């Protein structure tokens, strides 16, 4: 069993393990990480990581209480690129909706307002984590959508 893996590997595998939504206790997470080669991992380290990455206990599809990392609860850091704050971009025939990390919508909306009409954005309304974008022209909504997606390197 390998015991010297770097911190990036630990974080990547930790997040991968939580995405499985089958670990109900910290000791189960410790055992899974040890099985992945992190022999020096312990419960207190797992507890700190759960807190750092905003993990919560919730019910999975089998109605078991498990730890998970919901995307919308991801905590941005000071070094996070703006594109990491955009979680989803969608639209209908009249409006574009952007979902962001909590607290990031007004920042992203201000950026979108600054590029404004030349890029097809008439205006925005932002809450905490959702932005409604009114395109300058409904006929050109597809172009405006592509502009927004490319601005944040968003790919579905």
UniProtKB/Swiss-Prot annotation:
Gene Ontology molecular functions: arginine binding; DNA binding; DNA-binding transcription factor activity
Localization annotation: Cytoplasm
Transcription is among the record's keywords: yes
InterPro entries xrefs: Arg_repress, Arg_repress_C, Arg_repress_C_sf, Arg_repress_DNA-bd, WH-like_DNA-bd_sf, WH_DNA-bd_sf
Main location, first listed in the record: cytoplasm
Pathway the protein contributes to: Amino-acid biosynthesis; L-arginine biosynthesis [regulation]
Pfam family, one: Arg_repressor_C
Xref: SUPFAM superfamilies: C-terminal domain of arginine repressor, Winged helix' DNA-binding domain
GO biological process: L-arginine biosynthetic process; protein complex oligomerization; regulation of arginine biosynthetic process
GO cellular component, one term: cytoplasm
Record carries keyword Cytoplasm: yes
Keywords, alphabetical: Amino-acid biosynthesis, Arginine biosynthesis, Cytoplasm, DNA-binding, Repressor, Transcription, Transcription regulation
Function comment: Regulates arginine biosynthesis genes.
PANTHER family documented for this protein: ARGININE REPRESSOR
Family statement: Belongs to the ArgR family.
Protein name per UniProt: Arginine repressor
The organism of origin for this protein: Shewanella sp. (strain W3-18-1)
